[in-house]
Amino acid sequence: MARCRRHIRSRSRSRNQCQRRRRRSHYNRRRTYRRSRRHSRRRRVRRRGCSCRRCSRRRRRRC
């Protein structure tokens, strides 16, 4: 039975490859969008805790 099940699984995979690819591409798009938001947040955090000459002179922690 295990062999038969494996064969069935492989068949279903080959059939649903295009559908899976579509789903993956859509998921990746959302993922990249999330990443970009995260990066922007990180940059803001860095700006808050800045330690450059300009910020130290003006007693600011932003660049």
Curated annotation (Swiss-Prot):
GO molecular-function terms, A-Z: DNA binding
Residues spanning the signal sequence: none
The keyword DNA-binding appears for this protein: yes
Compartments where found: Nucleus; Chromosome
Disordered: annotated span: 1-47
BP terms from Gene Ontology: cell differentiation; chromosome condensation; spermatogenesis
Annotated GO CC locations: nucleosome; nucleus
Keyword terms of this UniProt record: Chromosome, Developmental protein, Differentiation, DNA condensation, DNA-binding, Nucleosome core, Nucleus, Spermatogenesis
Tissue: Testis.
Function comment: Protamines substitute for histones in the chromatin of sperm during the haploid phase of spermatogenesis. They compact sperm DNA into a highly condensed, stable and inactive complex.
Protein family: Belongs to the protamine P1 family.
Protein name as catalogued: Sperm protamine P1
Gene coding for it: PRM1
